Structures are given as structure tokens and as C-alpha cells.
């Protein structure tokens, strides 16, 4: 599963699917499969703007898809949001998938990895806040010491 989350699309694949998407768009009608393939490539890009664009394309597809297609759309919506570190959104999508498919092992594993990332980021965030609080307390102590020395 971590390979799916960390896999980067090749520039060549991205350009090929982008050309196909733009060609169909210019002709006036983009097929669901072309839009999904392009979105799937964008979600695997190393650039956040590409990932966001892929998410938008997947969200557009969601109401149009069959049950099987929707499962794929929701899964890659979770992957895209995970890659953007939008863990709450990723969790929302993966849990929605697990409501309809409680035995989906891929979704269970993705949920576990999202929870793990949230805990890691939460601990890192708490450490940063804690370090800042210690820094402020230390600075206040130094100021207090300087003031008391200047009075004596």
C-alpha cells in the first residue's frame, strides 16, 4: 500500500494522458475512462497543484460512475488527499468506502496508514508547540533575570 501512496507518475505518462484528455475535451466530450486515467496520473504527480487537479476530476466523476467505478474514484480521492496531507478528507473517503465494503483490505490498510500519519504529524505538531512554549518561558526567565540584575 505504501508503494501506491508514494508512486510517482512518469512525465511521459502524464503528458500522454494529458494529451488524450485535452484532445477529447477539444472535441466536446471526455469519456469517463479518459478522465479517470488522467486524474489517476495527476494524483500520482510530485506537484501538489497536479494532485489537486486530479482530485477535482475524480470528484466530477463520482456521481457519474457505476458502483465499481465509484469505488476506484473514492479510493484515489483518499490517496490524493493523503498525498496532500489532507488526512481528515482522506479518512472521510476511505471510511465511506469501508462502509460499503467493510472487507476491503486495501481500504483497511489505507485507513491504518492515514491514522499513522495523523498521529505522527500530531506528535510533531505537539513537539513544535511544546518547543515554542519552552522558548517563550526561557525568554521570559532571561528578561526577568536581566530586570532583577539591573535593579541591584
Swiss-Prot record:
This is Mitochondrial fission 1 protein. The modification N-acetylmethionine is found at residue 1. Residues 1-122 are cytoplasmic. The lineage of its organism: Eukaryota, Metazoa, Chordata, Craniata, Vertebrata. Ubiquitinated by MARCHF5. It is found in: Mitochondrion outer membrane; Peroxisome membrane. It is a single-pass membrane protein. One of its GO terms (molecular function) is identical protein binding. CDD domains: Fis1. Involved in the fragmentation of the mitochondrial network and its perinuclear clustering. Plays a minor role in the recruitment and association of the fission mediator dynamin-related protein 1 (DNM1L) to the mitochondrial surface and mitochondrial fission. May not be essential for the assembly of functional fission complexes and the subsequent membrane scission event. Also mediates peroxisomal fission. May act when the products of fission are directed toward mitochondrial homeostasis, mitophagy, or apoptosis. Signal peptide: none annotated. The C-terminus is required for mitochondrial or peroxisomal localization, while the N-terminus is necessary for mitochondrial or peroxisomal fission, localization and regulation of the interaction with DNM1L. The modification Phosphoserine is found at residue 10. InterPro entries: Fis1 (IPR016543), Fis1_cytosol (IPR033745), Fis1_TPR_C (IPR028061), Fis1_TPR_N (IPR028058), TPR-like_helical_dom_sf (IPR011990). Belongs to the FIS1 family. TPR repeats lie at residues 71-104. The keyword Nuclease does not apply. Its main location: mitochondrion. Keywords: Acetylation, Apoptosis, Membrane, Mitochondrion, Mitochondrion outer membrane, Peroxisome, Phosphoprotein, TPR repeat, Transmembrane, Transmembrane helix, Ubl conjugation. The chain crosses the membrane at residues 123-143. Residues 144-152 are mitochondrial intermembrane. GO terms for cellular component: mitochondrial outer membrane; mitochondrion; peroxisomal membrane; peroxisome; protein-containing complex. GO terms for biological process: apoptotic process; mitochondrial fission; mitochondrion organization; negative regulation of ATP metabolic process; negative regulation of fatty acid transport; peroxisome fission; positive regulation of intrinsic apoptotic signaling pathway; protein targeting to mitochondrion.
